[in-house]
Amino acid sequence: MSIEEENVPTTVDSGAADTTVKSPEKKPAAKGGKSKKTTTAKATKKPVKAAAPTKKKTTSSHPTYEEMIKDAIVTLKERTGSSQYAIQKFIEEKHKSLPPTFRKLLLVNLKRLVASEKLVKVKASFKIPSARSAATPKPAAPVKKKATVVAKPKGKVAAAVAPAKAKAAAKGTKKPAAKVVAKAKVTAKPKAKVTAAKPKSKSVAAVSKTKAVAAKPKAKERPAKASRTSTRTSPGKKVAAPAKKVAVTKKAPAKSVKVKSPAKRASTRKAKK
């Protein structure tokens, strides 16, 4: 019995040893489970990436809106262009598989083509621009800009030089004109004094001669003034006008004396009797 008892603990110890050996073997199994989870997570992410290109592959059964609009305008052959309603009706009859938002998309594309100058809008209709009309306005626009830029500085320089010359010439001509008038007045006074003792008829003739003499030098100076500037001739004309008015006033009192008027009335009364 003692021998058996001694053998029992040995077996127990061996079992305990076995249990201690088995326990560390479970840990790598747990690590292996985690690796499986990571692989499954990676597998689920891959189909998401594959779904994105499937959306890009969707193709429309009809051509682009630009092609459809131009085809409608060409086939309709309207002189003043095709309206939006006519283009819409033509496309709907020709292409049956259109999206439900076709009318809105058509309007948006029409506005876009007009903005990009691929179509021309006339009132409420649309036309394809001709090759001549599209080519001619582009080179014409820069030529006009260059002409205006070159013409502006020349016009300003000419305008600045012209008034400067006109002012300088006006200042130079106004002063000698005043001197000439003063000289004419001085010459007229001594002649009037000499002829004071003579009868009235001679004095009138002398005054007219003095006016004629004073007017002659002014007449000679007028062409010189006219050659320099056009504004110089105007003061000469104004000075000559009062001389003529004075002569008219002197002749008027001589004509106002009418002696024959009472004689005519007497003759008419005699005829009535």
From Swiss-Prot:
| Modified residues annotated as N-acetylserine in this record | S2
Q: Looking at the record, which segments are called Disordered?
A: 1-63, 193-273
Q: Which Pfam families match?
A: Linker_histone (PF00538)
**In which compartments does the protein localize?**
Nucleus; Chromosome
Q: Which ranges are annotated Low complexity under compositional bias?
A: 193-216, 237-256
Which CDD domains does the UniProt entry name for this protein?
H15
* InterPro entries the record matches: H1/H5, Histone_H1/H5_H15, WH-like_DNA-bd_sf, WH_DNA-bd_sf
Domain H15 span(s) in chain numbering: 61-130
Q: Where are the transmembrane segments?
A: none
Q: Which GO-annotated molecular functions does the record name? A: DNA binding; structural constituent of chromatin
Q: Enumerate the UniProt keywords alphabetically.
A: Acetylation, Chromosome, DNA-binding, Isopeptide bond, Nucleus, Phosphoprotein, Ubl conjugation
Q: At what positions is Phosphoserine found?
A: S14
One Gene Ontology biological process: nucleosome assembly
* GO terms for cellular component: mitochondrion; nucleolus; nucleosome
Question: Which portions of the chain have biased composition (kind: Basic residues)?
Answer: 33-59, 257-273
Q: Give the position(s) of the covalent cross-link described as Glycyl lysine isopeptide (Lys-Gly) (interchain with G-Cter in ubiquitin).
A: K156, K165
In UniProt terms, what function does this protein have? Answer: Histones H1 are necessary for the condensation of nucleosome chains into higher-order structures.
Q: Member of which family?
A: Belongs to the histone H1/H5 family.
Q: What protein name applies here?
A: Histone H1.2
Q: Which organism is it from?
A: Arabidopsis thaliana (Mouse-ear cress)
The lineage is:
Eukaryota, Viridiplantae, Streptophyta, Embryophyta, Tracheophyta
